[in-house]
Amino acid sequence: MLAPKRVKFRKQQKGRMRGTAFRGSTLSFGDFGLKALECGYITSRQIEAARIAITRHVKRGGKVWIRFFPDKPFTKKPAETRMGKGKGSPEGWHAVIKPGRVLYEIKGVPETIAREALNLAAHKLPIPTRFVSRQDVL
């Protein structure tokens, strides 16, 4: 699972997801990509599940890039615990995703295989996504 090696503080405030993504909104490495259409949180487990779905479908052909990183901790209180008494302990890591962010990129495979692989990955993610290619951008 992806997680930061070191952090200055164990816990963070939740924050608000407003606006669209300016950085990371265009294809940089691959020919095809998966772009987010709405904002949301994606956990490190979901990132890994989508990556495995892509690599298995392309049968280890081509190259896959993950264009985001889970750098925000989320906390959880134990089961059957009353409210209050402070914030829960850190449970895992997730990434804050804004609309327009390119999540995954693929290069070295035909468009049909890339479209199928990224569609499989999209089913593993909690936010709606769209297939993009370099020809759409040009």
UniProtKB/Swiss-Prot annotation:
CDD domains for this protein: Ribosomal_L16_L10e (cd01433)
Note the superkingdom of the native organism: Bacteria
Entry keyword set: Ribonucleoprotein, Ribosomal protein, RNA-binding, rRNA-binding, tRNA-binding
Gene Ontology biological process terms from the UniProt entry: translation
Any coiled-coil regions, as ranges = none
Q: SUPFAM superfamilies, alphabetically?
A: Ribosomal protein L16p/L10e
Subunit (UniProt): Part of the 50S ribosomal subunit.
Indicate what this protein is called per its UniProt record: Large ribosomal subunit protein uL16
